[in-house]
Amino acid sequence: MKLKHKHLLNLLQVNDFKVQNLDLKIPRNLFNKNKYFDLYQIYKELGGIQEEFPHIEEELYYIEPSTIIILDDYIHFNRYRNITLRSILYEQIPSFPLENYKRYCRNFEKECIKSGLPQRIWANRESDYYFGPSSSPGDFFKNGSGGWKLLAFKDLLEDAAAYAINYRVIRFSVYDNFLAEGKLMRLDNILDTPTHPLQQQLLKYIIRRIKE
């Protein structure tokens, strides 16, 4: 578990949130290419080469009632995630911070590059299967990064799968800002350490997002 994710989970647990891991297993026929929003079209726009979708294998944080908490770190914001954000699915989820996420994808891809060039992230066996061989790390002019595409599409699948079973997904970004002591603070700066003095202000922001 990544450090920021661990600190977020601990913050929720010590403040009496009942949190458990959720393995979001979804029937394969849910994502029939002709029936469920525009997932198939988005997959093909990303360069998908199979007639099936990837499995969702991430462990998500589940809290009552029927709510999933996800923390998106730096590698989730890039040109490929921006493509998935065009899905008409997001028109059905008014609580999703769509404009913020589009802006993060446009403005912070350089940060994604800093952490997203290692081979297991840029390309791997699964991404080769679904999107074909990747270009050299950092080369976006050919096939680009299959690993980044895979991660972006799985984010979309998570949102679609949760919507299909009437779960709420609340996505927090490391780039989110919240007001604390009269100043805008960025989420990643607070989650860098579990003893940050503004932890309680962060908790209030999280609770407000959950209740929206």
What are these regions (language model features)?
Residues 1-212:
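Nucleic-acid endo/exonuclease domains
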